[in-house]
Structure formats: structure tokens, C-alpha cells
């Protein structure tokens, strides 16, 4: 929950979230100002993503409380993890439930539309948006936008480690 890496990481996340609170801006507002998705801003501030040097000035402009030392820490590769109890948090539990419930159907559609492969969670964008449903009630839209990665046929003549050994 606190960005992994123990007590030091938890303290950094608390300081980052305090800087966000001082800004009085939502993740979406910060994202708009910095040119990032709202989920990526949250990932950065929770130390689940690495801040890139070219993005730092825009993020600092949006969140003035980010100190030089916090920005430097945000530029270090994070320890991506989660607390095992997080799955019991109701919003996260329901997201997991939705993926489990719809996952097999989504996988089948990916296979129909793209072939045998997966959606990347590395070359990946995610956002959360609020829209009004046909009934006028608020609805949550979670968008997963990941690069398609086809599974490889494991041909021995394409396996570089084997080709290197044969030519040595």
C-alpha cells in the first residue's frame, strides 16, 4: 500500500501525498496540468512508477510542494509491490472481481481480434473517468490501454543463446 521497500518508502509516500494535499488538486487536475493520466500521477505519488526527468518540471509546476529531494527519490526506480491486505479494500476487491468475472471473455475477444497474445502491463496506459449513465447516475470508467504482445513460436533457430553456442 505504501509503495513497497519498507518504512523508508512509506515515509516517502506520506511526504508525496502531503505535497499533493497542499496543492489542493485532484489526481485528474494534476494529470491535466502535467500531461499525464490521473492513474499515472497516483502511481508516481505512491512510488509505483518512476518519474522521468523530462516530466519532472511539469509535475513540479502542478505540485509546488515537491522538493528537490522528493523529485530525486521519484526518479529512482521504484520497488513495485502492494501490501497483501490491499485486496480486501472494497474498491480494489470489486476491480479484481470484475477482471476475474469478465477476464475469460476479454481474453477470447483479444484472441479473436489480435490472435494468440496478451495485453502489456508495461507499455500500458490507465485512466479513471467519471461519466453520466443513460439513467443520469454517475458511472466509473476504467480504461486499460495496453500494447498487444503476440506469443512467440519458440523456434530453436530464433533462440539467440543457442545460435551463439553453435557458432562458438
UniProtKB/Swiss-Prot annotation:
Q: Which CDD domains match?
A: Cyanase_C
Q: Which GO terms describe its biological process?
A: cyanate catabolic process; response to salt stress
> What keywords tag this UniProt record?
Lyase
Q: What is its EC number?
A: 4.2.1.104
Entry function: Catalyzes the reaction of cyanate with bicarbonate to produce ammonia and carbon dioxide.
Which NCBIfam families does this UniProt record tie to the protein? cynS
Q: What is this protein called?
A: Cyanate hydratase
Which source organism?
Oryza sativa subsp. indica (Rice)
Amino acid at each position: 500500500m505504501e509503495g513497497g521497500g519498507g518504512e523508508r518508502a512509506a515515509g516517502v509516500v506520506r511526504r508525496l501525498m502531503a505535497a499533493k494535499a497542499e496543492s489542493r488538486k485532484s489526481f485528474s487536475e494534476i494529470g491535466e496540468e502535467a500531461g499525464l493520466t490521473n492513474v499515472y500521477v497516483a502511481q508516481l505519488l505512491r512510488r509505483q512508477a518512476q518519474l522521468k526527468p523530462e516530466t519532472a518540471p511539469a509535475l513540479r509546476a502542478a505540485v509546488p510542494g515537491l522538493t528537490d529531494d522528493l523529485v530525486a527519490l521519484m526518479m529512482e526506480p521504484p520497488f513495485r509491490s502492494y501490501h497483501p491486505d490491499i485486496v480486501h479494500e472494497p474498491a480494489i476487491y470489486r476491480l479484481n472481481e470484475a477482471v476475474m468475472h469478465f477476464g475469460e471473455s476479454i481474453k477470447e475477444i483479444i484472441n479473436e481480434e489480435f490472435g494468440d497474445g496478451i495485453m502489456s502491463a508495461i507499455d500500458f496506459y490507465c485512466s479513471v473517468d467519471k461519466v453520466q449513465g443513460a439513467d443520469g447516475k454517475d458511472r466509473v470508467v476504467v480504461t486499460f490501454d495496453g500494447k498487444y504482445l503476440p506469443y512467440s513460436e519458440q523456434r530453436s533457430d530464433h533462440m539467440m543463446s543457442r545460435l551463439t553456442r553453435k557458432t562458438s
